[in-house]
């Protein structure tokens, strides 16, 4: 297969590839030897985080093709406990840079099963305790199905590694006194975005983690009045738009653009206190 301008690649066997450019051949073996690990493509400086009553740590803003930044993710600190929002590639590298050990993690909130939000689950499986796996049943089902296929394990074995905590879609759920609301978000695979809220010594605090989302323009072009045609209704579009523009104290947005990510201009009139 030609990649670009005379550079060809072919797959020889599992994780073994041969590149050809003007008669020069290079073989690349991506298989790992025992105890060998893939290196992270980006360096991260070390940070000292505080274990606050309620805090949000920005731990990534890239996508699955980004060689310079960790994938879109956040870390919630609540009452001193550590919760991840998604577990992407090189999650251990990110945690080490923040001074967080895998064995310190209380739970992980899952948005969806795309690799850049999912690939780090195998790292969490090796913790010395069952980390709480927090998601709606629909998201959990897609993740378990994919993980079982990739890791060659039975689907029922998922509960051997994680403590499953199901969330009710579109409702406020109590997770160890932290209120969490998963909201369905249009995306190529089943996806929920999250609202978090609590009350601390200052007052009510809220955080919105919106990854992954779709742009209003893409959704608008899908509107149809014909129920027999693929697409969405005007009512559905209005509902999604209203939820995307929910007012919170801090909102972290996926604005990667294109057909499957959000657009920054959609939030130019967002009523939230701070957008990231």
What does each of the following model-derived ranges do?
Residues 1-100, 166-247:
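Core dinuclear metal-dependent hydrolase active-site scaffold
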Residues 113-119, 141-142, 171, 188-190, ...:
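Active-site environment of divalent metal-dependent phosphoester hydrolases
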Residues 96-97, 121-123, 147-148, 221-222, ...:
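Short amphipathic alpha-helical segments
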Residues 170, 259-276:
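Binuclear metal-ion centers of metallo-dependent hydrolases, dominated by the metallo-beta-lactamase
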Residues 139-166:
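Active-site neighborhood of divalent metal-dependent phosphoester bond hydrolases
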Residues 136, 210-211, 253-257:
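Structural motif
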Residues 89-138, 241-252:
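Active-site metal-binding motif and surrounding structural segment of the metallo-beta-lactamase
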Residues 102, 150-154, 226-227:
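Short, hinge-like loop/turn segments at secondary-structure boundaries
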């Amino acid at each position: 297969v030609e990649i670009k301008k005379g550079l060809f690649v072919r797959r020889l066997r599992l994780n073994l590839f041969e590149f050809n450019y003007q008669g020069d051949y290079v073989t690349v073996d991506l298989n790992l030897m025992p105890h060998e690990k893939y290196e992270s493509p980006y360096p991260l400086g070390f940070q000292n985080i505080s274990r606050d009553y309620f805090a949000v740590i920005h731990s990534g803003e890239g996508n699955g093709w980004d060689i310079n930044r960790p994938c879109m993710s956040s870390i919630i600190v609540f009452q001193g406990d550590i919760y991840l929002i998604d577990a992407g590639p090189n999650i251990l590298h990110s945690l080490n840079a923040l001074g967080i050990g895998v064995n310190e993690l209380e739970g992980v909130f899952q948005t969806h099963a795309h690799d850049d939000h999912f690939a780090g689950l195998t790292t969490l499986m090796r913790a010395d305790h069952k980390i709480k796996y927090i998601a709606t049943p629909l998201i959990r089902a897609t993740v378990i199905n994919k993980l079982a296929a990739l890791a060659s394990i039975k689907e029922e074995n998922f509960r051997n590694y994680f403590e499953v905590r199901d969330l009710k879609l579109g409702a406020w759920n109590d997770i160890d006194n932290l209120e969490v609301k998963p909201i369905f978000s249009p995306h190529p695979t089943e996806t929920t975005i999250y609202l978090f809220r609590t009350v601390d010594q200052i007052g009510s605090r809220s955080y919105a983690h919106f990854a992954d989302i779709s742009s209003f323009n893409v959704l608008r072009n899908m509107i149809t009045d014909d129920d027999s045609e693929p697409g969405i209704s005007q009512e559905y579009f209005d509902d999604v738009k209203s939820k995307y523009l929910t007012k919170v104290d801090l909102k972290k947005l996926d604005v990667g653009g294109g057909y499957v990510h959000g657009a920054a201009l959609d939030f130019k009139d967002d009523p939230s206190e701070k957008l990231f």
